[in-house]
Amino acid sequence: MKLSDPKLFRQQNYINGAWEAADSGETIDVTNPATGEKLGTVPKAATAETRRAIEAANAAWPAWRAKTAKERAAILRKWFELMMANQDDLGVLMTAEQGKPLAEAKGEVAYAASFIEWFAEEGKRIYGDTIPQHGADKRIVVIKEPVGVVATITPWNFPAAMINAKPVHHLPLAARL
């Protein structure tokens, strides 16, 4: 597998601003499904690493919440731009670890990036709403605000598009980029 920018190929967990191995040092092999060739490894993270990641995200939360919608949008926009600038390499990586045709993998990168772009733009348009009340002496107002650190488990058919996808030991590299 040849990437134009080899720095994109990461084989560690990203926790609290740093790339690190699993505490145990154990890894899981990632192979090309077409050839069986080993592409690399990913850390076999456990409870301690998960807790550190959650704690780091919670510690970063107040600073993120304090940013204006425009500032948050600029960060998300930069992420979108980086994905699109590296679309070819990300497509090569997905093709190697999933067996998808290269054109489909590159399309998935653009599809994944489009979600980030959408949230960057919509985040600037978050307004509170007034909802019709059931009584003359009531006013119901909706205030939209960040709520905190969340996690989700989603299907793994589109690893770049489903950034929070559940880990599967055959396809973890594309979601780390």
Q: Can you describe what each PLM-predicted range is?
A:
Residues N13, A21, T95, K124, ...:
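Short glycine- and Lys/Arg-enriched binding-loop motifs that mark or flank ligand-binding interfaces
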Residues L39-Y127, A136-D137:
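Glycine-rich loop-to-alpha-helix module at the N-terminal edge of alpha/beta enzyme cores
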Residues G17, G36, R72, I116, ...:
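Residue-level signature of catalytic and energy-coupling elements of molecular machines
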Residues N32, K44, K144:
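Conserved strand-loop elements at the edges of beta-sheets that form or border functional pockets
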Residues M1-A34:
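Hydrophobic face of amphipathic alpha-helices that form TPR/SEL1-like repeat modules
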Residues D129-L177:
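Conserved small-residue-rich beta-alpha loop and adjacent elements
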